[in-house]
């Protein structure tokens, strides 16, 4: 009597499932980030987070290339991706904010709680994307927001305003940029995002002992990425061919 029905697994299925494993590896990188943040090694935490985001950036194109959805229809890459995104974009940055005590007590705790709850609700919104691939409402990219606050060594007041304003904007019909998928001003948007990323990595290499010109650059590029979606929403003809 056979309890298991063994079959030869096609190479296409092995290849497709390996992409899911790649995506899931982001959870382990996030765990390493949690360990680092718990020990107040925030520079190390952001390096682990950066690696997780690199995985997040490459797994989608690879999945489409090898047709994961068609080969493994019973495994939801979208669900897996959302789980990893919530951990890396929301939970880990919120924990870092709390551990750092950036906003003081008890407000760092309150802010972290507001971040994780509002973001969980946002992930359930089926209409979070517009027809032009803007995000409707603040798209819970708390990894970028909290990282920027660390880079500029924000004061309690500044950090509080940024965090609680972003929580409120999560639920308002204001457009936010997806730097890759939005076509309007795409070359400029990608260029600004690249500059922000390079400056951020430089700040990490300096262990957040950030010179003024880097702070100015991070703030300027970060503000652009934060508000350009709303500007394009107000001026619907701007950036159209």
UniProtKB/Swiss-Prot annotation:
<feature type="transmembrane region" description="Helical; Name=1">
    <location>
        <begin position="16"/>
        <end position="36"/>
    </location>
</feature>
<feature type="transmembrane region" description="Helical; Name=4">
    <location>
        <begin position="101"/>
        <end position="121"/>
    </location>
</feature>
<dbReference type="Pfam" id="PF01066">
    <property type="entry name" value="CDP-OH_P_transf"/>
</dbReference>
<keyword id="KW-0464">Manganese</keyword>
<feature type="transmembrane region" description="Helical; Name=7">
    <location>
        <begin position="188"/>
        <end position="208"/>
    </location>
</feature>
<feature type="transmembrane region" description="Helical; Name=8">
    <location>
        <begin position="212"/>
        <end position="232"/>
    </location>
</feature>
<keyword id="KW-0997">Cell inner membrane</keyword>
<feature type="transmembrane region" description="Helical; Name=6">
    <location>
        <begin position="157"/>
        <end position="177"/>
    </location>
</feature>
<feature type="topological domain" description="Periplasmic">
    <location>
        <begin position="98"/>
        <end position="100"/>
    </location>
</feature>
<feature type="transmembrane region" description="Helical; Name= 3">
    <location>
        <begin position="77"/>
        <end position="97"/>
    </location>
</feature>
<dbReference type="InterPro" id="IPR043130">
    <property type="entry name" value="CDP-OH_PTrfase_TM_dom"/>
</dbReference>
<dbReference type="GO" id="GO:0005886">
    <property type="term" value="C:plasma membrane"/>
</dbReference>
<keyword id="KW-0808">Transferase</keyword>
<dbReference type="GO" id="GO:0008654">
    <property type="term" value="P:phospholipid biosynthetic process"/>
</dbReference>
<keyword id="KW-0443">Lipid metabolism</keyword>
<feature type="topological domain" description="Periplasmic">
    <location>
        <begin position="37"/>
        <end position="41"/>
    </location>
</feature>
<feature type="topological domain" description="Cytoplasmic">
    <location>
        <begin position="63"/>
        <end position="76"/>
    </location>
</feature>
<keyword id="KW-0444">Lipid biosynthesis</keyword>
<feature type="topological domain" description="Cytoplasmic">
    <location>
        <begin position="1"/>
        <end position="15"/>
    </location>
</feature>
<feature type="transmembrane region" description="Helical; Name=2">
    <location>
        <begin position="42"/>
        <end position="62"/>
    </location>
</feature>
<feature type="topological domain" description="Cytoplasmic">
    <location>
        <begin position="122"/>
        <end position="133"/>
    </location>
</feature>
<feature type="topological domain" description="Cytoplasmic">
    <location>
        <begin position="233"/>
        <end position="241"/>
    </location>
</feature>
<keyword id="KW-1003">Cell membrane</keyword>
<keyword id="KW-0594">Phospholipid biosynthesis</keyword>
<feature type="topological domain" description="Periplasmic">
    <location>
        <begin position="155"/>
        <end position="156"/>
    </location>
</feature>
<keyword id="KW-0472">Membrane</keyword>
<comment type="similarity">
    <text>Belongs to the CDP-alcohol phosphatidyltransferase class-I family.</text>
</comment>
<keyword id="KW-1133">Transmembrane helix</keyword>
<dbReference type="GO" id="GO:0050520">
    <property type="term" value="F:phosphatidylcholine synthase activity"/>
</dbReference>
<comment type="function">
    <text>Condenses choline with CDP-diglyceride to produce phosphatidylcholine and CMP.</text>
</comment>
<feature type="topological domain" description="Periplasmic">
    <location>
        <begin position="209"/>
        <end position="211"/>
    </location>
</feature>
<feature type="transmembrane region" description="Helical; Name=5">
    <location>
        <begin position="134"/>
        <end position="154"/>
    </location>
</feature>
<protein>
    <recommendedName>
        <fullName>Phosphatidylcholine synthase</fullName>
        <ecNumber>2.7.8.24</ecNumber>
    </recommendedName>
</protein>
<keyword id="KW-1208">Phospholipid metabolism</keyword>
<dbReference type="InterPro" id="IPR026027">
    <property type="entry name" value="PcS"/>
</dbReference>
<dbReference type="InterPro" id="IPR000462">
    <property type="entry name" value="CDP-OH_P_trans"/>
</dbReference>
<feature type="topological domain" description="Cytoplasmic">
    <location>
        <begin position="178"/>
        <end position="187"/>
    </location>
</feature>
<keyword id="KW-0812">Transmembrane</keyword>
